[in-house]
């Protein structure tokens, strides 16, 4: 697991990561406004999109709270790091992924606030196909290898008319649950973060908004098919909402509540809409 630290504080348990003296270079009235101490909170993320966290840090400056991002490339790592006390929060996964990880691995972590929906989209290898209609028998389609996003990708292929899945498997079917291939595509599984890199070896790949954005792809402009995230027509949408997660013992931590509240502001909504141009959809209760 590759890991990039923005800051080097450490800590675990109920307290935020670290508390340090605020900088002393500010002068005059500005110095008077600075809090005496800064509470640093380490947040685990996956991918390179972080503009919203810059806005959050600006909003929390007067409260003496500073978010420092720990960037992971392995989707299995942030929940393990959170559970083990290596980070304070994480913000990289949807509710279905979190529920599956807790059930499978016994993590004592919970979501404490909604953030965004990162729609899955089908991206084409432009050297091979130019539209969804051109996908044919034998074409390789790459999908995420983890259970929740892999199942989500199979449901997207079903929605697009390529396969039929066993309805009893709900929203997390596996390849073994495909009951019919309407087009005899060759479905290959790969770790989510690698899908954009292997696109040249496929006809198409199914990539979520975060990994797509990191790879320079935009679901609005570059995809040939995007997941239906309208809750009125897709009952699974509530489980696709990304969340901020904390250890269960910290679910009522006041500092963490302020971070969630800062995320749920018009300023952060504007940053997400301006920076990501449709790659992410704000999904907290009053985001509309």
Model segments located where?
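A bilobed periplasmic-binding-protein/Venus flytrap-type ligand-binding module shared by bacterial periplasmic
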Residues: 119-132, 239-253
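A conserved helix-loop-strand patch within extracytoplasmic ligand-binding domains
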Residues: 112-163, 269
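Periplasmic-binding protein-like
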Residues: 149-158, 262-284
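Ligand-binding "clamshell"
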Residues: 100-112, 126-128, 201, 206, ...
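Bacterial lipoprotein signal-peptidase II cleavage site
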Residues: 5-29
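Pocket-flanking alpha-helical
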Residues: 57, 75-106, 214-216
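Short helix-initiation/N-cap motifs at beta->coil->alpha
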Residues: 69-80, 169-197
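Short, polar/charged alpha-helical segment
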Residues: 40-42, 46-71, 77, 81
């Amino acid at each position: 697991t590759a890991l990039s630290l923005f800051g080097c504080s450490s800590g675990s348990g109920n307290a935020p990561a670290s508390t340090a003296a605020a900088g002393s270079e500010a002068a005059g009235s500005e110095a008077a406004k600075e809090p005496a101490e800064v509470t640093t909170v380490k947040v685990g993320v996956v991918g390179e999109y972080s503009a919203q966290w810059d806005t959050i840090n600006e909003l929390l400056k007067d409260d003496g709270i500073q978010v420092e991002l720990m960037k992971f490339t392995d989707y299995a790592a942030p929940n393990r790091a959170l559970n083990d006390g290596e980070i304070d929060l994480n913000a990289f996964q949807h509710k279905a992924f979190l529920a599956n990880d807790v059930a499978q691995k016994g993590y004592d972590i919970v979501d404490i606030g909604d953030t965004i929906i990162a729609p899955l989209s089908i991206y084409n290898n432009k050297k091979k196909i130019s539209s969804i209609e051109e996908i044919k028998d034998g074409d390789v389609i790459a999908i995420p290898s983890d259970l929740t996003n892999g199942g989500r990708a199979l449901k997207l292929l079903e929605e697009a008319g390529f396969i039929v899945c066993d309805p009893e498997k709900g929203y997390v079917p596996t390849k073994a649950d495909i009951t019919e291939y309407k087009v005899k595509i060759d479905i290959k599984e790969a770790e989510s973060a690698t899908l954009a890199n292997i696109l040249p070896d496929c006809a198409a790949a199914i990539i979520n908004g975060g990994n797509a954005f990191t790879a320079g792809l935009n679901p609005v402009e570059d995809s040939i098919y995007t997941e239906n995230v309208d809750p009125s027509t897709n009952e699974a949408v509530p489980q696709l909402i990304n969340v901020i997660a904390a250890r269960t013992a910290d679910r009522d931590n006041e500092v963490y509540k302020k971070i969630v509240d800062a995320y749920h502001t018009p300023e952060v909504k504007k940053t997400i809409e301006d920076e990501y141009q449709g790659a992410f959809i704000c999904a907290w209760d009053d985001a509309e």
